[in-house]
Each structure stands twice: as structure tokens, then as C-alpha cells.
């Protein structure tokens, strides 16, 4: 495959690397018996976009207009698409080292691709293959036996039933006994006692029926907002409606629209996001995990490592000790 595109290094890639590498095992023992859906867990939105392929076709799920523009004016369309598609700069191992424990994996099969090669996708496809990435995650977990990850497998563009079966077989072969089968949301102590480290949510109903190792899709509160205050209002509205019963994600990721892109031709998603991180981080620090109807659980963001987001989310668990 061709070269990859990544976010610029306009922020320190070392901001929170390694400091939170083993944060779950370092939690106060009182929190080891709290179910995962009542803990505060940092996540990354569109985890794999650090390795988008400059030469890949536009995703077939994108609009017909974008497909036509890419064919007619590729030298203009492609750079614009790429700079608004990248949401992460750290690779998956660096994200795990930084403390991220929810990975948002948008999986696809390119029509032009090899029969069994699955990629990740966000408007364009990644250089990374799914099987290689899952292996990388498994190897990281072997080095961190008391850390737990939630892998949200979704999108599934171009996947036939046979490819779903192939993907699930890869998941089982790679993670083996690390997989926590579907059931009540476990605590860290329960997972540790069973040697389990991986919860796989899988947004395909037929696959769920066939494989008890897979969990239903984790709800994601996606605000689809350009402005920070509008996104925060959306999240507060969702909280007022009551949290879901199990694992769920509050996404603090801003989202561009066509009007914004046309009005800001020199910008990118990174340039739009970074100046707004202080306000988003302030909102994060106000949250509280737990069973209450307005409590948060997983909080996912863009450009992990750009600020203290991961540490802020982890620190919310201290509020559970005040109850």
C-alpha cells in the first residue's frame, strides 16, 4: 500500500505516554469491585486514523458527490478529505501506553482489496490491516496482564457473512482466553481472576447470535457539532435523559460540516480541535462516574496525547471513593 497520512506533530506525543500505562492495576483496591460500566474509562474516537492511506480510494459509503469530485479533481479533493479525516496522531500502542482503554475500530473490506484483507476506514482506508492491529493489541496486553480493553468493532463496510465469520475467527484466534464472553458487565477483580482482558463489542446482529464471545454495540453519544458549546449542550441533554444501563461512550469529538470546511480552507480537524481542548477538558473534569442517571462511563476524544485528557478521565474514578 502507499504512504500514510497522520496528524502533524504540533503537540507533544509524550504528553501522557507511559504515565498511565498500567492505570487500571494502580486503581485503589476499593474500585476493583466496581463494574466497568460504572468506572471512568478513556477512549479514542476513530482510533486508527493515524495511518490513513494517501493512495486509497474514497470509501464507497461516502456521498456520490464526493466520489465524483475525487474522480474529477483528485489533486484538490484528496488533500481536503485527508486533513478532515485524521482524528489521531498516536498509533494504537502509543494510545494504549497513554491509558486509552476503549478503541473505536471502524472495519471495512475494500472492493478492490485482497479477498481476506480487512482495513479500517474513515472516509478513506488505512494502511494498517485489521489482523495485524489486533495482534499488536494482544501483544500489548500480554505485557500488561492486569489492563483491560474494550474493542468496539463497527461500520463493517463491504463485509459479507463469510468475512464476518473470518473476522470473528481472527478475534478468537488472536485473543483466545483473554476474551470475556457476553454476560453481566464484569469488575476488574472478576476479569483478573479469570485471566480475561478483552471485551469485544460487535455491531452485527447475526454475528452476535452465533458467537457468545461478542458483546452488543456500545452506545456512542455523538454530538455531530462544530462548536464546543453546542457539543457540551448536546452531552448535557443526553445526560438529562439518563445514561444507558451498560457500557456507553460520551464523545467529546467535534465534527466539521461542509459549510465549515468551505469557510476554513486552510484548516483541518486537528486545527479545529486543539484550540477547543481546554474547554472540553473542563467539561470532562466536571463529570462523575457511577450508577447515577447523569453519570458518565467511557469518554472518548480526538488527538489523544495533545493534553491531559486521559489523566483527567482516569482521575474521575477518585470521585467514586467519596461516596
UniProtKB/Swiss-Prot annotation:
This is PI-PLC X domain-containing protein 1. The gene coding for this protein is located in the pseudoautosomal region 1 (PAR1) of X and Y chromosomes. The lineage of its organism: Eukaryota, Metazoa, Chordata, Craniata, Vertebrata. GO terms for cellular component: cytoplasm. Its main location: cytoplasm. The keyword Amino-acid biosynthesis does not apply. Residues 30-206 form the PI-PLC X-box domain. It holds the Pfam family PI-PLC-X. Gene3D superfamilies: Phosphatidylinositol (PI) phosphodiesterase. Keywords: Cytoplasm. CDD domains: PI-PLCXD1c. GO terms for biological process: lipid metabolic process. PROSITE patterns: PIPLC_X_DOMAIN. Widely expressed.
Amino acid at each position: 500500500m502507499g504512504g500514510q497520512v497522520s496528524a502533524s506533530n504540533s503537540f507533544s506525543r509524550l504528553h501522557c505516554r507511559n504515565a498511565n500505562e498500567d492505570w487500571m492495576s494502580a486503581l485503589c483496591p476499593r474500585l476493583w469491585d466496581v463494574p466497568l460500566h460504572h468506572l471512568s474509562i478513556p477512549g479514542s474516537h476513530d482510533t486508527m486514523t493515524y495511518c490513513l492511506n494517501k493512495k486509497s480510494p474514497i470509501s464507497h459509503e461516502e456521498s456520490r458527490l464526493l466520489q465524483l469530485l475525487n474522480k474529477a479533481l483528485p489533486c484538490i479533493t484528496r488533500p481536503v478529505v485527508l486533513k478532515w479525516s485524521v482524528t489521531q496522531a498516536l498509533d494504537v500502542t502509543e494510545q494504549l501506553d497513554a491509558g486509552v482503554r476503549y478503541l473505536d475500530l471502524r472495519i471495512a473490506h475494500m472492493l478492490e482489496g485482497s479477498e481476506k484483507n480487512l482495513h479500517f476506514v474513515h472516509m478513506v482506508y488505512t494502511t494498517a490491516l485489521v489482523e495485524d492491529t489486533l495482534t499488536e493489541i494482544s501483544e500489548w496486553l500480554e505485557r500488561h496482564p492486569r489492563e483491560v480493553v474494550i474493542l468496539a468493532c463497527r461500520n463493517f463496510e463491504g463485509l459479507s457473512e463469510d468475512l464476518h465469520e473470518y473476522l470473528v475467527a481472527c478475534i478468537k484466534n488472536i485473543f483466545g482466553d483473554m476474551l470475556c464472553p457476553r454476560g453481566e458487565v464484569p469488575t476488574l477483580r472478576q476479569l483478573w481472576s479469570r485471566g480475561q482482558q478483552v471485551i469485544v463489542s460487535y455491531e452485527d446482529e447475526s454475528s452476535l447470535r452465533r458467537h457468545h464471545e461478542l458483546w452488543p454495540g456500545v452506545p456512542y453519544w455523538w454530538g455531530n457539532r462544530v462548536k464546543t458549546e453546542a457539543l457540551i449542550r448536546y452531552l448535557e441533554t443526553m445526560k438529562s435523559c439518563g445514561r444507558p444501563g451498560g457500557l456507553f461512550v460520551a464523545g467529546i469529538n467535534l465534527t466539521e460540516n461542509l459549510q465549515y470546511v468551505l469557510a476554513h480552507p486552510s484548516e483541518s480537524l486537528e486545527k479545529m480541535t486543539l484550540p477547543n481542548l481546554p474547554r472540553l477538558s473542563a467539561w470532562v473534569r466536571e463529570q462523575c462516574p457511577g450508577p447515577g442517571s447523569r453519570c458518565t462511563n467511557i469518554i472518548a476524544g480526538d488527538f489523544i496525547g495533545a493534553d491531559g485528557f486521559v489523566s483527567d478521565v482516569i482521575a474521575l474514578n477518585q470521585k467514586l471513593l467519596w461516596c
